[in-house]
Amino acid sequence: MAVPAAAHGVEPGRVVLGARDGWAAGTTGGAAAAPRDVRTVSKRSELAAALAAKPGVPKIVYVRGTIEGNVDARDRPKSCDDFADPAYSLPAYLAQYDPATWGKTPVSGPLEEARARSQANQAAQVVLDVGPNTTVVGLGGAKLHGLTLRVTGDNVILRNLRFEDAHDCFPQWDPLDGADGNWNSEYDNLDLVGATHVWVDHNDFGDGDNTGSVEYFGRKYEVHDGLLDIVTGSDLVTVSWNRLHDHDKTMLIGSTDRPDADAGKLRVTVHHNEFTNIGQRAPRVRYGQVHVYNNLYRVPEVASYTYSLGVGVESRIYAEENFFRIPAALPLGALVEYWKGTVLHATGTLVAVGHGRPRPVDLLAEYNAANDPDLGPDVGWTPTLVPRLDPAREVPARVTAGAGPGRAFG
């Protein structure tokens, strides 16, 4: 028996998304699973087997305890050295591609090829695909550590999970990324790749203790990519009541400026989420009609912050009734970033500066006053799939009390 999200006292895996709750409205996941297709897992090998079983058949997977991703087929821990190709070592890589001698040419050659093979070795263990008609629910304090769940199917629900520290042992140096080059890594905690009808609800996303401060070539040796990315023609997604925190690149909706797979898709609802100590991409959008409402943004300091709303190519962000708490040193115009987009709807925003009282802020006007070219206000659509729109003044209390795992089942 499938029941709507508002229902209480029912088996968590049978809960479905309500008929008006964002772009993924009506998503059922594995709610129709037969009893034989309901499994509880506590190891990576068990999770992989449960997700791969009976492709397309409705299934419910309950996660108990902490599942480690960096393990072998028998769930024994593996280190970065265990994944490394025999021809790869970090000291040799640093010596080969030092910008002082290598310059601005894209990295290539045997050492880069060995790094790529090393990365593929790790990916074979830490990336698990989630197919169609699947519900994955955490029990208690369930955690996925060092794992990437990659949703590639239709009709998927992921709830009550802690996604932590999906890290890349083998970042790549890109001398052309920015003025000084950058280290780039693979692996998001949760990846939606060509996925449709997906509900991501009451989860926690972060880096755990792996905050990383090592630098090479004067740039942070970045072992993390995104927390939650929605890319490659994914569509009809609702992201609700999650905590996303202590991370740089947070939520990317659309990964390329090319329209090949994304035009007319990437329709996403982002509501009642808490973004705390986030550097950027909350979210950054290309192409999609994205409804961003009733979210709580906490920016504790300026040094690690870049922006919150990224206005990308052909994006159509409709932001309303969001609440920001920011430091006094952060200009209001910095909350929005231009990424080749042209329009932004932003109404009902409240901003509290420091410990001050919140006040209404016109995000679009603040951005336009500080930047050229101006963004226009007409995004060409109005959201209708909204079960409840809270006034921004109520957002801090509601989201603080309700977002994240352990609060999903009332």
Task: Give the predicted meaning of each segment.
Residues M1-G9:
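Secretory targeting and sorting signals
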Residues A49-G56, V71-T135, K143-R159, D165-L176, ...:
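Extracellular beta-strand-rich solenoid/capping regions of secreted or surface-exposed proteins
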Residues I60, L192-V193, V198, V311, ...:
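Helix-rich interaction surfaces within compact, conserved domain-sized segments
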Residues P132-G140, D154-H167, D188, G194-T211, ...:
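Right-handed parallel beta-helix
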Residues Q172-W183, D209-V223:
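Short, flexible helix-coil linker/hinge segments at the edges of structured domains or between repeats
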Residues A19-Y62:
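Acidic Gly/Asp/Thr-rich repetitive segments characteristic of extracellular carbohydrate-active
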Residues S45, T66-G69, G141, A329:
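Acidic glycine-/aspartate-rich tracts in secreted/extracellular proteins
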Residues R284-G410:
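Extracellular beta-rich repeat passengers
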